[in-house]
Curated annotation (Swiss-Prot):
Protein name, per record: Cytochrome b
Cofactor: heme b
Major place of residence: mitochondrion
Protein species of origin: Antidorcas marsupialis
Oligomeric and partner information: The cytochrome bc1 complex contains 11 subunits: 3 respiratory subunits (MT-CYB, CYC1 and UQCRFS1), 2 core proteins (UQCRC1 and UQCRC2) and 6 low-molecular weight proteins (UQCRH/QCR6, UQCRB/QCR7, UQCRQ/QCR8, UQCR10/QCR9, UQCR11/QCR10 and a cleavage product of UQCRFS1). This cytochrome bc1 complex then forms a dimer.
Keyword annotations from UniProtKB, A to Z: Electron transport, Heme, Iron, Membrane, Metal-binding, Mitochondrion, Mitochondrion inner membrane, Respiratory chain, Transmembrane, Transmembrane helix, Transport, Ubiquinone
Gene name for this UniProt entry: MT-CYB
Length: 379
């Protein structure tokens, strides 16, 4: 009798995606982050669902309801902190996953890559709206500052901002709709992740060499299932260390003060995972220019396949490109640091130089390094 997992209409989909899937024999731990992102998403949906059972999306009670979750709900504190720090783990995995794609040339899978960029935007939108929900000072002012950026759009800007707000400022209507969107978006992300996986399985996985691995494939189960379980255990260990020992390490103390439209915090800043983009936004004195730079800082990923000038796919055997890649990583860390600093000397000029270097590296220096690499190998 043929195995049921290979014949059953539902089980064979799972089988072809996670069990009998032919996988390259040499993919490293950098390939673990896709499955870790899936785990993060499931964890966020589950903890978020339990939080939504006790949360009220109303300006008068939102802050109190979060306090109630932490004080009165059974294990509410751990659910709340798992959700908040789970977002940080999500973005660590996301940035690593994208970095892996850049380093090993995975962006040559065009559809997979483009769906991935859409996933990144959707996740960033979800995280931003989630940060508004506790209705603390940084929630309110973060929402005000970021939504206000849309007013830089010529002609329709002001109307667009007021339409998103549902009034003339960030208020009850804004909070209610942000909760609605924050609830629905993770399910859209889950659907997009399935599309992402669908396109990936059309081509099969890339591998560190960037060479076709069709000649040497192994089944996903048990080899990569056990490897993914190890990754998942390490992820959960890191998350729980964060949650149980320093749950507020990555948060902002200002968010423990209820939102007050009459009192602006001295330094408005987003969560750490948006600081690099925030630094790029602030480094341009012009409002519209800053908004465009902010969007382009992420949208530039779409251009990666067009900017690939090397004859090799992966950076594994390209020392010059590797050097540029790690300079880019260092630059992003610098931007993250600058985004959390006040707007004063010397942080302004450092932020501007780091922003220029960011775009220069991706648009000019990395393609040039690839071309020089080709010429050195007489290609």
């Amino acid at each position: 009798m043929i195995n049921m997992r290979k014949t059953h209409p539902l089980m064979k989909i799972v089988n072809n995606a996670f069990i009998d899937l032919p996988a390259p024999s040499n993919i490293s731990s950098w390939w673990n982050f896709g499955s870790l992102l899936g785990i993060c998403l499931i964890l966020q949906i589950l903890t978020g669902l339990f939080l939504a059972m006790h949360y009220t999306a109303d300006t008068a009670t939102a802050f109190s309801s979060v306090t109630h979750i932490c004080r009165d709900v059974n294990y509410g504190w751990i659910i709340r902190y798992m959700h908040a720090n789970g977002a940080s783990m999500f973005f660590i995995c996301l940035f690593t996953h994208v970095g892996r794609g850049l380093y090993y040339g995975s962006y040559t899978f065009l559809e997979t890559w483009n769906v991935g960029v859409i996933l990144l935007f959707a996740t960033m939108a979800t995280a931003f709206m989630g940060y508004v929900l506790p209705w603390g000072q940084m929630s309110f002012w973060g929402a005000t500052v970021i939504t206000n950026l849309l007013s830089a759009i010529p002609y329709i800007g002001t109307n667009l901002v007021e339409w998103i707000w549902g009034g003339f400022s960030v208020d009850k209507a804004t909070l209610t709709r942000f909760f609605a969107f924050h609830f629905i978006l993770p399910f859209i992300i889950a659907a997009l992740a399935m599309v992402h996986l669908l396109f990936l399985h059309e081509t099969g996985s890339n591998n560190p060499t960037g060479i076709s691995s069709d000649a040497d494939k192994i089944p996903f189960h048990p080899y990569y299932t056990i490897k993914d379980i190890l990754g998942a255990l390490l992820l959960i260990l890191t998350l729980m260390l964060l949650v149980l020992f320093s749950p507020d390490l990555l948060g902002d103390p200002d968010n423990y003060t209820p939102a007050n439209p009459l009192n602006t915090p001295p330094h408005i800043k987003p969560e750490w995972y948006f600081l690099f983009a925030y630094a790029i936004l602030r480094s341009i004195p012009n409002k519209l220019g800053g908004v465009l730079a902010l969007i382009m800082s992420i949208l530039i990923l779409v251009l990666m396949p067009l900017l690939h000038t090397s004859k090799q796919r992966s950076m594994l055997f390209r020392p010059m490109s590797q050097c540029m890649f790690w300079i880019l990583v260092a630059d992003l860390l610098t931007l993250t640091w600058i985004g959390g600093q006040p707007v004063e000397h010397p942080f302004i000029i450092i932020g501007q130089l780091a922003s220029i270097l960011y775009f220069l590296l991706i648009l000019v220096l990395m393609p040039v390094a690839s071309t020089i690499g080709n010429n050195l190998l007489k290609w």
